[in-house]
């Protein structure tokens, strides 16, 4: 079993992923953390020194490497789940879960974040990116509302996984 969590930045993928992995008693991996470990740089530093294209390629490589593991929960970066090729790859290897949040919730959660390169863009550009990515994220196997407390999001995912296993 491989569970991939996708969604926009600040949707709660890492928090939910950590809790979900504990509930299932399987390891949790955060693609962003693994990218930073591999490069020895923060994500903003990678963007600045090597560019977004390099980061996106590396992110997909890390995803593929993590997907060699069995029985894992993998939290993806916001851009990875919006990459159709990456999303199709994840769907072929496991179950994709879209943690959906309203744009207003994203703004509230991310307002103090200095570590996210995409937040340097104008607000209307971020809103457009949010809407574009949401269309792709919606192709996930399971969709949950991420504005609820993380423990409730985990319960909803677990129920959906049970339903999928039973053919529901």
Curated annotation (Swiss-Prot):
Gene Ontology terms describing biological process: amino acid biosynthetic process; aromatic amino acid family biosynthetic process; chorismate biosynthetic process
Pfam families: SKI (PF01202)
Cofactor(s) in the UniProt record: Mg(2+)
Catalytic reaction(s) noted: shikimate + ATP = 3-phosphoshikimate + ADP + H(+)
Binding of Mg(2+), residues: 14
Compartments, record wording: Cytoplasm
Subunit structure: Monomer.
Family the entry assigns: Belongs to the shikimate kinase family.
Matches recorded under HAMAP family: Shikimate_kinase
Identification of the protein by name: Shikimate kinase
Protein source organism: Aquifex aeolicus (strain VF5)
Lineage: Bacteria, Pseudomonadati, Aquificota, Aquificia, Aquificales
Primary gene name: aroK
């Amino acid at each position: 079993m491989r569970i991939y969590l996708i969604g926009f930045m600040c949707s709660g993928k890492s928090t939910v992923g950590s809790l979900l992995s504990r509930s299932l008693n399987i390891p949790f991996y955060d693609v962003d953390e693994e990218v930073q470990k591999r490069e020895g740089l923060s994500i903003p530093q990678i963007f600045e020194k090597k560019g977004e294209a390099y980061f996106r390629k590396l992110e997909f490589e890390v995803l593929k490497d993590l997907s060699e593991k069995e029985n894992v929960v993998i939290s993806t970066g916001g851009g990875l789940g919006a990459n159709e090729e990456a999303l199709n790859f994840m769907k072929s290897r496991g179950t994709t879960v879209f943690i959906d949040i309203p744009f207003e919730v994203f703004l509230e959660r991310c307002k103090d974040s200095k570590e996210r390169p995409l937040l340097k863009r104008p607000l209307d550009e971020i809103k457009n990116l949010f809407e574009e990515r949401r269309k792709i994220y919606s192709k996930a196997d399971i969709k949950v509302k991420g504005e609820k407390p993380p423990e409730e999001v985990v319960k909803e995912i677990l129920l959906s996984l049970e339903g999928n296993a039973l053919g529901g």
